[in-house]
Amino acid sequence: MRSRACAAISALLVVIAGDRGLAGGYNANVLKLAAQESGNVEVLPIGKRSAEYFAHHEAELFTQEVLLAADISVGQCFQLARQITEGYRKGEFDAVKLCYTRFDSMMTQTAVSIEVLPLAMEPTEQQKAEARRSQILYKPSSEEVFSAIIPEYVAGVVYGAVCESVASELAARRTAMDAATKNAGEMIDHLNLYYNRARQAAITQEITEIVAGAEI
């Protein structure tokens, strides 16, 4: 869609979708939500369907590696988190957003978008006043704290979103398959009814012809 040289990247968009289809609107809903993100974004796709979608649309990708949602590990999430926070710290993008499917129940799953970075931590007026009165010098520096803690936070958020997305995919697929099974059963019932009607009509026609022939 555009190169780094053409425009600055405003955000990194982590998009979690499924590895397979036959899950109702699960993949379509989260990909549609991600497509609504405005600005020049770089995409980190997780899930085969997510990778295929953004490759087809020639999006700027954070990595060329195809990460399967069902197989991604905690260790891989920590590795991604370190790369993400390092890119954010260097100013390669201004924000990190996460699009995934929140698991509400077996019947309900919702595609959502959340902002992971920057952290929204607005202090209260009391905290501001206490900070002004305080003469305490905190160590280590905020830079060291960011390097140590934020990657763990990002990894936890990403892995939690992956787990919810996988659970949502399984629930959506089960619902879709239940609906397909029910529809197939109803279709079989209708076809049996049509078959029995046609068979009965043929038998009635044969009896009518036999009776008519006997009367002659």
Model-derived features: where do they sit?
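C-terminal beta-strand-loop-alpha-helix "lid" module of Rossmann-like NAD(P)-dependent dehydrogenases
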Residues: M1-I216
